[in-house]
Amino acid sequence: MFDAKNFLANVTHQPGVYRMFDEKGQVIYVGKAKDLKKRLSSYFRTNLNSKKTSALVSHIHSIETTITASETEALLLEHNYIKAFQPRYNVLLRDDKSYPYILLTKERHPRITSHRGSKKVQGEYFGPYPHAGAVRETLSLLQKLFPIRQCENSVYNNRSRPCLQYQIGRCSGPCIDGLVSDEEYQQQVDFARLFLQGKDQQVLEHLIKKMEQASMQLNFEQAAYFRDQIQAIRAVIEKQFVSNERLDDMDILAIAYQLGIACVQVLFIRQGKVLGNRSYFPKVPANTDLSELTETFVGQFYLQGHQGRIIPSTIIVDHVLNEKHELEVLLTEQAGRKVNIQDNVKGNKSKFLHLAQMNAQAALVTQLKQANLIQERYQALQELLSLTTIKRMECFDISHTMGEQTIASCVVFDTEGPLKSDYRRFNISGITAGDDYAAMEQALLKRYDRPLENEKIPDIIFIDGGKGQLNRALQVFAQLNVSWDKNKPILIGVAKGVDRKAGLETLIISKQNKEVNLLPDSLALHLIQHIRDESHYHAIGGHRKKRQQAFTQSGLEAIEGVGAKRRQALLKYLGGMQGVKNATLAEISSVPGISAALAERIYETLRSE
């Protein structure tokens, strides 16, 4: 039992972070305090008024502290520890992904495109948008309003005639000399920039002036073009929910909680417009106060900077935060400008908060229905396999085209469904083309022939395939020389039916040494189909990406003496890679910058492929 009295006697009154461990040495809770001794002493009072705290204290085996220079530093360190250790008594934000942005590049003829990840590309970033669909929708709209190129530079630099986008009026064709002047193109770029900044009226004023000037100069064709552009923009503005009140960029957070599941709804407002919303379902320990949940979510959401997330000027929440000031100080420091957290709002801000609350409640209802269905499916699978619990399942699939660009996928489900942060893909190499057995063996070795923490050992491993695939998997596990319990997982082959129809699968269960055909309406089968299909799509996605990379590589990169400029010249003068491959030696020699010796090397290399 933990000796609290002896431990507290040596704890400092300085600010810092504490980590609580259970008897297995696992971190079960991370907290911060401006006075470590005072805060830690509060856990060991005789009259604890929180069930959550009582449960936590009963599992404490040891405590470690880290002294910090300030409360602000303690707050940041706390969230770093939560991210690193994922303690079960802390609120945890699951599977957060980086947000997509719209990027306007900094080039002679800027292109407009979507971007996710670190902001290494020079240009202006607009967003964040809640999901990729919102970015695609906005890009499609921009293409209709402003004829700016969206093509990759590799395409733009090698055009010899305008593409289809030019033909249908969605690009002004800056890739071809004479179609649009630099000034005219830049003007459309400026309009798009203003539009993305929410300055729609400025765009309209400029366009109206342009239309009037063109009309006065009797250039009626250009005047009609500007008129159509004005009408299109007005039609878009009428559909958008725009506040008349001048609003800074802000995020609005609302929480709905029921039956142990919490939904945090984040509503993104930029220049008074709703960019979109996104629902989060963090892991919440039982009996967690909603103010604590809000506080922890704000810290994790904005202070874990790997997502490339921009901190807005204003964050509106629907619960009072005990550490509002400390969070504001830290967020201001991170953002490099003043950040306000507001919990008592009026006017349009109140309307936006109400909108977020309605969305949170609606998303929670949907999630509860889904969670109940998942639990029913897990229960059915447990009964089928005579298991008391299933905490983790993994499923493998192989994807290739005629044995080329082989990819293996591993997807992971926990008790809440897909655990996408643990998904993995494996490049398969050094095997006979099309040998799925060898591919599966290589994937399993890459996954399991290494140390595993107890919670990472799956209860079930599904192999998408019949007896042959399953037998190869069993051979791999028999040969594993690892410290973890390799006999724990049940290996199950999922063989497709005669007509490869869903619902006709045969399950080959290794430990029970039997084959099972479940009814099409079986909840256990539905769960197996879900994880199998998820693995299949994950494998296909990786394979397609790898195949596309192989397809788009020109084949010129590996030829000595062919750098970027010569490669560009070859593609431009000979009409793309197919033209280069079909060109005669004389045609290759005629390309500027290509000597006779280099032309011969290119010709021979491409012929030998």
Swiss-Prot record:
Boundaries of every GIY-YIG domain copy: 13-91
Keyword Iron among UniProt keywords: no
Cellular location(s): Cytoplasm
An annotated GO cellular component: cytoplasm
Chief place of localization: cytoplasm
SUPFAM superfamilies: C-terminal UvrC-binding domain of UvrB (SSF46600), GIY-YIG endonuclease (SSF82771), RuvA domain 2-like (SSF47781)
Location of the UVR domain: 201-236
A Pfam short name: UvrC_RNaseH
UniProt keyword annotations, A-Z: Cytoplasm, DNA damage, DNA excision, DNA repair, Excision nuclease, SOS response
UniProt-listed Gene3D superfamilies: 5' to 3' exonuclease, C-terminal subdomain, GIY-YIG endonuclease, UVR domain, UvrC, RNAse H endonuclease domain
GO biological process: nucleotide-excision repair; SOS response
GO molecular function: DNA binding; excinuclease ABC activity
Domain of life from the UniProt record: Bacteria
Protein role: The UvrABC repair system catalyzes the recognition and processing of DNA lesions. UvrC both incises the 5' and 3' sides of the lesion. The N-terminal half is responsible for the 3' incision and the C-terminal half is responsible for the 5' incision.
NCBIfam families per UniProt: PRK00558.1-5, uvrC
The family this protein is said to belong to: Belongs to the UvrC family.
Subunit record text: Interacts with UvrB in an incision complex.
Protein name per UniProt: UvrABC system protein C
The organism of origin for this protein: Histophilus somni (strain 129Pt) (Haemophilus somnus)
Gene encoding the protein: uvrC
